[in-house]
Amino acid sequence: MTSATPQPGQLIVITGPSGVGKGTLLRQLRQRHPELALSVSATTRPPRPTEVAGVDYYFVSVEEFKAMIAAGQLLEWAEFAGHYYGTPRQPLVQLIAQGKTVILEIELQGARQVRQSYPQARHIFILPPSLAELEHRLRSRGQDSEEAIARRLAQAETEIAAAPEFDVQIVNDDLEKSLIALETAIFSPAP
């Protein structure tokens, strides 16, 4: 386990295809490093059975989400798989001002938007070992239709092609090794 201290007040952007294991990695990371702050996104999608409102996401209606966009309350937002996702601006700004290291897990389009506002943020891309393994993981979740899985896999190919845009790429083929690589990326001094 890496024990170095991250740079105060920094933003870490984590992106990767749906089903790549971002959530699992972040849960493990937070257990090891409770000092890290996790940005909570807003979404219009319904909660999954294990998700907690206000902890995993702020679950809002499409109308509420559009009002947040109109009021400039979102740092970034995107539509993905038929639902809206976005990052409420004010909590993120407050956490960074308090010197916290904030982890922001978002989709590719959102990561590109954040780079415009926070060019100094560290951008990390989580890759699957292969598309076949990604498909296996998506099917194992048992929550998507065949059509949704096909859509997510097609989107994954586009996202994977963008991985070189990111400061660090981590192939999530072994949880512990991936977690160590993620810790190294977060806690190492910026180049």
Curated annotation (Swiss-Prot):
Compartment(s) of residence: Cytoplasm
EC numbers, comma separated: 2.7.4.8
EC main group: transferase
Substrates-to-products reaction catalysed: GMP + ATP = GDP + ADP
CDD domains per the UniProt record, alphabetical: GMPK (cd00071)
GO CC annotation: cytosol
Main subcellular location: cytoplasm
Alphabetical keyword list: ATP-binding, Cytoplasm, Kinase, Nucleotide-binding, Transferase
Domain of life: Bacteria
Molecular function, one GO term: guanylate kinase activity
Segments forming domain Guanylate kinase-like: 9-187
Cited InterPro entries: GK/Ca_channel_bsu, Guanylate_kin-like_dom, Guanylate_kinase, Guanylate_kinase_CS, P-loop_NTPase
Residues the entry annotates as binding ATP: 16-23
Family listed: Belongs to the guanylate kinase family.
UniProt function note: Essential for recycling GMP and indirectly, cGMP.
HAMAP family in UniProt: Guanylate_kinase (MF_00328)
Name of protein: Guanylate kinase
Species name: Thermosynechococcus vestitus (strain NIES-2133 / IAM M-273 / BP-1)
Gene this chain is encoded by: gmk
